[in-house]
Amino acid sequence: MPVTDAIAQSLPIIAVSNLIKQFGRFAALRGVDAEFCVGKFYVILGDNGAGKTTLLRALAGLAHPTRGTISIQGKTPQEACRKIGYMAHPSLLYDEMSGIENLRYFARLYDIAGDERCEEVIRAVGLDPEMARAVGQYSQGMRQRMSLARAILHDPKILLLDEPFSNVDVHSAREMVGLLKGMRDAGKTILVVTHQAALLEGVADEFVWMQSGQIVERTREPGGEHSGAGTR
């Protein structure tokens, strides 16, 4: 029987079981259990130190669990790395290169030939691919947009974005939200760590609240029981 779009979007693309991550005696993640489904937009909220970034890094394959498992359609994050686009905070860009030079470098890692895709994603985030200025001379908002371009360059199925709207003006942030909404509508799974939940109200499918290394609440709206945390 064929899998319909509705059925596909109810299937988990990411499954996390009893995820623990310790740094010495400090437990950044304390037994996280969660599933994230195909084509859904999730916002991860919580105070600083709640474990949000550590969870995102673990899902991206950059923080190895002390205990527990992460399955991305039956594979580890490392095995599924080409399905994942990760935007770090602060950004992972080469300051001495221009934006297009940065993307050319990463395009080679993904076996993407030519400049067409690089130019496409730069325009998609509202920047000019002809801009010769080195990334080190960008404003913080421009760096964030170029970091998003890097994350979507290889057309991943999953986007893991850490504070994508930090230091971005409201108009540009709304443009970025519109781009992400379109990608979600096209079937991508998106997880965003942010302190700006209001930007994503009416766009996100679910708000995931973290506290002391655990997921403590999942809601359809940003005003959950723990809404005082991580939304400022």
What are these regions (language model features)?
Residues 194-195:
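H-loop/switch region of ABC-family ATPase nucleotide-binding domains
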